[in-house]
Amino acid sequence: MIGWLEAMLRVGRKLFVKAETQLYPEEKPKLYPRSRGRIVLTRDPDGQERCVACNLCAVVCPVGCIDLTKAVADDGRWYPEHFRINFARCIFCGFCEEACPTSAIQLTPDFELGEWRRDALVYEKHDLLISGEGKVRGYRYWSVAGKAIDGKDKGEAEHESPPVDLRGLLP
């Protein structure tokens, strides 16, 4: 009988305390700076796509929700002909962002991806591309890469030494 009375007193005391429930759509939750949400593809400061279709993001993805195909532009740059992410399968782990050597793929704090149909959660390249540079400002991959493109040969990138002539090293 005393145990029952103690339990009722505990419940009675909590009865008049204000609840800590957040009313989600009206009150937005506090998001931390490193929170991981929707994936976007960013652009160079010049306005060109940063993605070089190296396929590292698709390889490192634990659920295999990224699909892309590489193409080569006239000036020698690589770009993704198609880039597709299935957000119905994505677990927002951030491995793709860490693996990207060009900082093209980035996770934003936007997490509201509710849809009525699953096929609406498959985003194509035109859905993922944003107009800005994202979190990494002023980075131009092709100006620091050791790959030859139109207007830049190997060894002419920023902070790059000229290539070594291996035949000149032979005795």
Curated annotation (Swiss-Prot):
EC number: 7.1.1.-
Domain (4Fe-4S ferredoxin-type) ranges: 39-71, 81-110
Molecular functions (GO terms): 4 iron, 4 sulfur cluster binding; iron ion binding; NADH:ubiquinone reductase (non-electrogenic) activity; quinone binding
Binding site for [4Fe-4S] cluster 2: 61, 90, 93, 96
Catalytic reaction equation(s): a quinone + NADH + 5 H(+)(in) = a quinol + NAD(+) + 4 H(+)(out)
Membrane topology annotation: Peripheral membrane protein
A single GO cellular-component term on record: plasma membrane
Residues that bind [4Fe-4S] cluster 1: 51, 54, 57, 100
Cofactor(s) recorded in Swiss-Prot or TrEMBL: [4Fe-4S] cluster
Pfam families, per database record: Fer4_7
Keyword Kinase: no
Keywords assigned by UniProt, alphabetized: 4Fe-4S, Cell inner membrane, Cell membrane, Iron, Iron-sulfur, Membrane, Metal-binding, NAD, Quinone, Repeat, Translocase, Ubiquinone
Enzyme class name: translocase
Protein's cellular compartments: Cell inner membrane
UniProt record, GO biological process: aerobic respiration
Cofactor info, note text: Binds 2 [4Fe-4S] clusters per subunit.
InterPro entries cross-referenced by the UniProt entry: 4Fe4S_Fe-S-bd, 4Fe4S_Fe_S_CS, NADH_quinone_OxRdtase_chainI
Function per UniProt: NDH-1 shuttles electrons from NADH, via FMN and iron-sulfur (Fe-S) centers, to quinones in the respiratory chain. The immediate electron acceptor for the enzyme in this species is believed to be ubiquinone. Couples the redox reaction to proton translocation (for every two electrons transferred, four hydrogen ions are translocated across the cytoplasmic membrane), and thus conserves the redox energy in a proton gradient.
Family, similarity comment: Belongs to the complex I 23 kDa subunit family.
Alphabetized NCBIfam families for the sequence: NuoI, PRK05888.1-1
Subunit: NDH-1 is composed of 14 different subunits. Subunits NuoA, H, J, K, L, M, N constitute the membrane sector of the complex.
HAMAP family per record: NDH1_NuoI
Protein's name in the database: NADH-quinone oxidoreductase subunit I 1
Originating species: Rhodopseudomonas palustris (strain BisB5)
Underlying gene: nuoI1
